[in-house]
Amino acid sequence: MKDPELISWTTLPNIFLVATTDSGKVVGCIAYKQVNFDTVELGRNSVDKEFRRLGIGQKLLRTILKTAKDNGYETVLVSTSIAQLHAQKLYEKMNFKFVCFKPSLFHPLFTYLTGLKAMEYKI
């Protein structure tokens, strides 16, 4: 049985990319999901711990930003938290800007304590 959320991320106009080794092992992934006619939101961003600090995450991010631009999108959104400091630094390095603390479905204190924030990239 397939993951229903994953299916929604892989149905056009949504995009799901993977990074693999020469032997075909998947070591990273990234996706975007269309929010509206000119905006997509990143998700499913991950690199296997054994393969981090090799530039794979940056290459995946560059590739998906180019894909978004090539498909006519103007804005790319991403949500991250204080627990994902390495991801925040990568997004900032790639010119994402902090927009706001993202409201969540949880109590506002949860959002505050986790530092759940939204970042934006203009193409």
Describe the function of each predicted region.
Residues 1-43, 48, 61-62, 101-104, ...:
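Acetyl-CoA-dependent GNAT
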Residues 9, 69-70:
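Residue-level signal for alpha-helix termini/capping positions
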Residues 37, 85-86:
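Short alpha-helical
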Residues 38, 54, 71-74:
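Short coil/turn segments at alpha/beta junctions that flank glycine-rich nucleotide-binding fingerprints
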Residues 47, 53-66, 92-93:
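Conserved acetyl-CoA-binding loop-helix of GNAT-fold acetyltransferases
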Residues 74-77, 81-85, 92-123:
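C-terminal "cap" of GNAT-fold acetyltransferases
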